């Protein structure tokens, strides 16, 4: 089995195919798996296996996504492909499948289309750092001048959304040709993966980022002090280090006097651990669910921010009606709901269920957040939308 050969010592990168409907995203995903399977670093996948994407839930929203994995000489990749446009929007905004980079698929027969633009904008908003372009269907649109024009158009489009359009690699190929085993087109898949290897940066591992733990619960241990519990979101923490309690009340620094996991004492807690953190000189009433413990200076509390949001459709459990300027739902960050008001961008009268749009949010109390923080929008405990912080304002 090809599966045995995955080498976990290679750097891991999360990637995804984006682009307009029917431009060949899923065919390309299948082609990458199939071509790399011949080199023994992937399992061959048929189009239908990828297209029948299973449902998953993220932040209370159902999304269809297909996950495949493959490796090149240099890296291990987890690749996400979504069957429908709405799934892409939801996926990017909820961060259900984190993307460290994207493969933008554009058909050479059509050029950039409305969803091409929308996906580029979303990628920009949610912080996808770089993309590689695959100009697909070059076996059909085989006029080099036409391909040249489409390539220029894509580069200009990338530039208009703040990507480096001049230096973005553009590979001209045919996903279907490669899937059918035509050597010239298979070579283009190798060329694409080489560009992805070289152009898309390796992300920092979660463990190497500044420490952050969202507080889920607090308790007092007689004679020892206050313990907060939660799952470490990123970074690592050692006994004796200082952390800040951020959000809701004024930020304060405290010293960690103990770390426990499954009733065992530890020297350190790392990303992914569910841990209890013992804090020196803190009263239980001074800490609460919804705050975070963080490396001092790494994250600050904010009340006002710009965000990109998706409003759930009625059949997804969302609202039945549009919401207007001044709408006041709850914003669920990590472990808690905070009420806030929504200001729509100029020229937007209302937000209909199923829309995605940019808004400004003002919360009633400050919460630890930064560019890229994810949240749900809730109304009486049910999720009616999801969002990503694009920029903190105050």
Swiss-Prot record:
Top-level EC class as recorded in UniProt: hydrolase
GO CC field: cytosol
Region (G1) residue spans: 19-26
UniProt GO MF annotations: GTP binding; GTPase activity; translation elongation factor activity
Binding site residues for Mg(2+): 26
Domain of life: Bacteria
InterPro entries assigned: EF-Tu_GTP-bd (IPR041709), EF-Tu_GTPase (IPR050055), EFTu-like_2 (IPR004161), EFTU_2 (IPR033720), G_TR_CS (IPR031157), P-loop_NTPase (IPR027417), Small_GTP-bd (IPR005225), T_Tr_GTP-bd_dom (IPR000795)
Alphabetical UniProt keywords: Cytoplasm, Elongation factor, GTP-binding, Hydrolase, Magnesium, Metal-binding, Nucleotide-binding, Protein biosynthesis
Region of interest called G3, as start-end residue ranges on this chain: 81-84
Residues that hold GTP according to the record: 19-26, 81-85, 136-139
Catalytic activity: GTP + H2O = GDP + phosphate + H(+)
Region (G4) location: 136-139
Subunit relationships: Monomer.
Similarity annotation: Belongs to the TRAFAC class translation factor GTPase superfamily. Classic translation factor GTPase family. EF-Tu/EF-1A subfamily.
Biological role: GTP hydrolase that promotes the GTP-dependent binding of aminoacyl-tRNA to the A-site of ribosomes during protein biosynthesis.
HAMAP family: EF_Tu_B
Name this protein carries in UniProt: Elongation factor Tu
Species whose genome carries this gene: Mycoplasmoides gallisepticum (strain R(low / passage 15 / clone 2)) (Mycoplasma gallisepticum)
